[in-house]
């Protein structure tokens, strides 16, 4: 029976062996269907129809079942002769790779035939009934059974195909069994067993070839891969790139071939400017940006944003910044509030919390790990020295492995410093973010350490170290390096705003901390020392820093000046400290001759005679005074002193007005009053020019006085020690010697000269006064009734000696000593004299005022 219309494909029939049944093979024709449950009709013809020869054009064979699990059934139509005998049995084996397990014997005409065959590891039920040959999937991979009575009711679509089953080897063929204990499968060929072993989960089954080196642990599926792996231990790279100039080597030929593909594509994209070639168009576009300034055609449409971009992808990435609030992926780790616009970025961020770094650099002796593949690839550029980002500035030539590094480098060519330190008080700026990061670590390390503040009152800069503060003072405030330790010393003086009375104006533009210091610069105890100095009546004024706070009135270079010493003020022991009285400069009107009082005699003096010890640094007279500019800051409120007119005649330097008030006794000496009337001005008390040394009588008379004004070129530790010792002795003695000293005091005036042995004042005579400061400073009231104003020029005739310095009292300007004016604030230490009873009848002397000139102070 021919059914050419329903044939699936032509099939060839194999050679017959000994008149036996022919082996049916699958034809090469197209299949009629591919869906599950679809039937295929095949026409099979027996050898009796046309003789023993093969008839390939008439014997189609069934195709193997499709891979879908659906229980495909194959209906094979056979033309079987009526008088078929037993030797006409057919062995149905459609596929050459399948081995039949049962031979289906030919039955008599009209009899039913059933059996089981295995095709591609799948058991099929074979039924031949009344000329119709049926193949159907078995319900389960069970042993083959020949039960014709149970199989007629089996429908083709009711069976489920099973892919796994033992491969039965044909008789006489070697069998390769699976070595797994729970697997009993066997295969006819070795490569089939290898493929089957890959399905098992054990390491031995998947990778049986282990590396023999200790500590390696690698295993492979084939011996070739193990051999290739062993070459990596020996650092062997036998496969070299043949392209000239490349020189790269590889461990396998596969890696070499993959590398060669890159060389083949290098010449595909060529730059028209520099003729450089690139493997991809994207790399060519990236390269061309270095030749031309790229256009930015893509502009952000968000309201208020005017940014433009080169590519669309860059614009899209920017747009996410405007819509981050709409969809954000927040980190769920406790204490972390970071948000990301993509889930993949959040996933990478979470690895920073978990410590997972799955991407490891395989370079030699590197071992760096990363949270993402992009960071690993970026890191590998360092090993390959891939500096693809080159600075476009002509003459620079620097290249970088990362684009952000090039961007940060480009800022250095602009000369700007956009990165500013956010710490309050720190104004440091940097051109690179990395420099700011390094700088910020200093603030983190010095959180608990005290900060050094600039000692200049108008500057609020803070510094982490004293070295930085000193460099700032020298660079910004033009101070000398040797003055910085004196500026650092804290001042125990009360600010001028607290000391000034309602009728006085506050000091302006003067830094008291820079002018005065209560302790030496190298002293370690500042607070305790200042309290002790105030209690003892001793205070040291550092006048070496005066020039830096006077606005340039003094020369900055003091090489031509003499040695500069501190100013030591020793208050009288009988006078309690008070902040409401002028500064006490002395307690007696006794005047000394030049060279008549030495430092050695000061130790033997009575403490009552030394009421105030003042050490002023003055310039050597042998040196020329530098040219000075008249000061515009000095004002003389009230009446103008007489010495001002005398000073202006020479035009050398202005005067620093320091009125000195001389309080007289109730019964002044007539000679003094007569001298004042004849001169109509300040008392002409001038130091004698005699250089003879006074005798013991003069010293005893000096010691009998109530006090004196003594000038010494001190300032060293020896001078301070003498001052302290004198005050201590004076406190121990008390005021007993002061009462008897007033009775023996005498005053004589001869030709306008006062001789120290014969000139004495009363018990309550003293030098007190108020220093005048620049404009806006302290005001000096007009001389009250009963007060005399004298002019005291400070001179130094013998600076190299150890003797005392002379003090001249004269209303006239010295012809051979130039004056030197210093704008010196005075709120240092104020003392007041206790007014004794009967101190009401003071004689009034109307004197406009006078000055004290401090020369060569810096």
Curated annotation (Swiss-Prot):
Sorted alphabetically, the Gene Ontology cellular component annotations on this record are: nucleus
Role of this protein: Cooperates with CIITA to promote transcription of MHC class I and MHC class II genes.
Q: What start-end ranges are recorded for coiled-coil regions in this protein?
A: none
The residue ranges flagged as biased composition, category Low complexity, are: 142-152, 635-651
ZnF region ranges: C2H2-type: 176-200, 209-233, 239-263, 269-291, 298-322, 329-353, 359-383, 389-413, 419-443, 452-477
Question: What the entry says about post-translational processing?
Answer: Sumoylated at Lys-661 with SUMO1, SUMO2 and SUMO3; sumoylation enhances the activity of the transcriptional activation domain.
Q: How does it assemble?
A: Self-associates. Interacts with ZXDB and CIITA.
- Protein's cellular compartments: Nucleus
The residue ranges flagged as biased composition, category Polar residues, are 624-634, 681-692
Q: Output this protein's name.
A: Zinc finger protein ZXDC
Q: Which SUPFAM superfamilies match?
A: beta-beta-alpha zinc fingers
Q: Which residues lie within the region annotated Disordered?
A: 1-73, 85-108, 142-175, 624-652, 671-714, 727-751
Question: InterPro entries, alphabetically?
Answer: Zinc_finger_trans_reg (IPR051061), Znf_C2H2_sf (IPR036236), Znf_C2H2_type (IPR013087)
Lineage of the species this protein comes from: Eukaryota, Metazoa, Chordata, Craniata, Vertebrata
Say which family it is in.
Belongs to the ZXD family.
Signal peptide extent:
none
Q: Where is the composition biased (Pro residues)?
A: 59-68
Which residue pairs form cystines in this protein?
Answer: none
Tell me which Pfam families the record gives.
zf-C2H2 (PF00096)
Tell me a Gene Ontology molecular-function term this record carries. Answer: zinc ion binding
What broad class describes the main subcellular location of this protein? nucleus
Tell me the residues linked by Glycyl lysine isopeptide (Lys-Gly) (interchain with G-Cter in SUMO).
661
Q: Which organism is it from?
A: Mus musculus (Mouse)
UniProt record, GO biological process: positive regulation of DNA-templated transcription
Record's keyword terms, sorted: Activator, Isopeptide bond, Metal-binding, Nucleus, Repeat, Transcription, Transcription regulation, Ubl conjugation, Zinc, Zinc-finger
Stored SMART domains: ZnF_C2H2 (SM00355)
Originating gene: Zxdc
């Amino acid at each position: 029976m021919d059914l050419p219309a329903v044939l699936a494909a032509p099939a060839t029939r194999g050679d017959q062996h000994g008149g036996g049944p022919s082996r049916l093979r699958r034809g090469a024709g197209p299949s009629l269907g591919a869906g599950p449950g679809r039937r295929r009709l095949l026409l099979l013809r027996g050898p009796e129809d046309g003789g023993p020869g093969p008839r390939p054009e008439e014997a189609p064979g069934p195709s193997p079942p499709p891979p879908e699990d659906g229980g495909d059934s194959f209906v094979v139509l056979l033309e079987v002769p009526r008088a078929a005998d037993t030797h006409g049995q057919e062995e149905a084996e459609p596929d050459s790779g399948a081995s039949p397990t049962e031979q289906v014997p030919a039955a008599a005409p009209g009899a039913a035939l059933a059996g089981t065959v295995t095709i591609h590891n799948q058991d099929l039920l074979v039924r031949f009934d009344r000329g119709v040959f049926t193949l159907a999937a078995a319900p389960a991979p069970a042993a083959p059974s020949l039960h014709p009575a149970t199989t007629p009711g089996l429908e083709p679509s009711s069976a489920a195909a099973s892919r796994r089953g033992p491969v039965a080897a044909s008789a006489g063929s070697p069998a390769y069994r699976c070595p797994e204990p729970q697997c009993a499968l066997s295969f006819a060929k070795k490569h089939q067993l290898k493929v089957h072993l890959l399905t098992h989960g054990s390491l031995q089954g998947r990778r049986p070839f282990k590396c023999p080196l200790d500590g390696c642990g690698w295993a492979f599926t084939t011996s070739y891969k193990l051999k290739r792996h062993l070459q990596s231990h020996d650092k062997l790279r036998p496969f070299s790139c043949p392209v000239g100039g490349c020189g790269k080597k590889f461990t396998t030929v596969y890696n070499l071939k993959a590398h060669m593909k890159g060389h083949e594509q290098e010449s595909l994209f060529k730059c028209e400017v520099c003729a450089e070639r690139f493997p991809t168009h994207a790399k060519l576009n990236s390269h061309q940006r270095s030749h031309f300034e790229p256009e930015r055609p893509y502009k952000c449409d968000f309201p208020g944003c005017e940014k433009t971009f080169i590519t669309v992808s860059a614009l899209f990435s920017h747009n996410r910044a405007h819509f981050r609030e709409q969809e954000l992926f927040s980190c769920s780790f406790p204490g972390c509030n970071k948000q990301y616009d993509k889930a993949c970025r959040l996933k990478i961020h979470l690895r920073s919390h978990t410590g997972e770094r799955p991407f490891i650099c395989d370079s030699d002796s590197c071992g760096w790990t990363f949270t993402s593949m992009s960071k690993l690839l970026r890191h590998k550029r360092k090993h390959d020295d891939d500096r693809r980002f080159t600075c476009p500035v002509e003459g620079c030539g620097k290249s970088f492995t990362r684009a952000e590094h090039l961007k940060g480098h480009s800022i250095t060519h602009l000369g700007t410093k956009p990165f500013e330190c956010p710490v309050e008080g720190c104004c440091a700026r940097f051109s690179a973010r990395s420099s700011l990061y390094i700088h910020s670590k200093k603030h983190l390390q010095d959180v608990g350490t005290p900060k050094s503040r600039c000692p200049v009152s108008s500057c609020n800069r803070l510094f982490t170290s004293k070295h930085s503060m000193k460099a700032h003072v020298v660079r910004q405030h033009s101070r000398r390096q040797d003055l910085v330790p004196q500026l650092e010393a804290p001042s125990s003086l009360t600010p001028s705003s607290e000391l000034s009375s309602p009728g006085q104006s506050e000091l302006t533009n003067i830094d008291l901390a820079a002018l005065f210091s209560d302790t030496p610069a190298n002293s370690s105890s500042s607070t305790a020392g200042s309290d002790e100095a105030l209690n003892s009546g001793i205070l040291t004024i550092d006048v070496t820093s005066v020039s830096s706070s006077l606005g340039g009135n003094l020369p900055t270079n003091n090489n031509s000046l003499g040695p500069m010493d501190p100013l030591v003020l020793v208050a009288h022991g009988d006078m309690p400290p008070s902040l409401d009285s002028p500064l006490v400069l002395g307690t007696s009107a006794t005047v000394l001759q030049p060279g008549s009082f030495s430092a050695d005699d000061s130790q033997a003096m009575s403490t009552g005679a030394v009421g105030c010890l003042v050490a002023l640094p003055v310039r050597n007279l042998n040196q020329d005074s530098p040219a000075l500019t008249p000061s515009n800051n000095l004002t003389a409120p009230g009446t103008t002193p007489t010495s001002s007119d005398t000073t202006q005649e020479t035009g050398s330097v202005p005067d620093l007005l320091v009125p000195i008030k001389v309080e007289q006794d109730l019964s002044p000496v007539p000679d003094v009053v007569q001298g004042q009337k004849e001169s109509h001005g300040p008392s002409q008390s001038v130091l004698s020019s005699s250089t003879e040394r006074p005798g013991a009588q003069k010293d005893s008379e000096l010691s009998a006085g109530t006090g004196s004004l003594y000038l010494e070129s001190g300032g060293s530790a020896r001078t301070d020690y003498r001052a302290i010792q004198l005050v201590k002795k004076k406190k121990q003695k008390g005021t007993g010697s002061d009462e008897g000293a007033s009775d023996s005091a005498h005053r004589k005036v001869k030709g306008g000269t006062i001789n120290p042995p014969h000139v004495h004042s009363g018990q309550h005579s003293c030098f007190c006064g108020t220093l005048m400061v620049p404009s806006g400073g302290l005001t000096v009231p007009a001389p009250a009734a009963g007060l005399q104003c004298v002019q005291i020029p400070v001179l130094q005739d013998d600076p190299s000696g150890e003797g005392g310095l002379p003090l001249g009292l004269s209303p006239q300007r010295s012809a051979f000593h130039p004056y030197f004016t210093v704008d010196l604030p005075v709120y240092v230490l104020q003392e007041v004299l206790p007014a004794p009873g009967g101190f009401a009848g003071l004689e009034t002397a109307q004197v406009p005022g006078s000055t004290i000139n401090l020369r060569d102070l810096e």
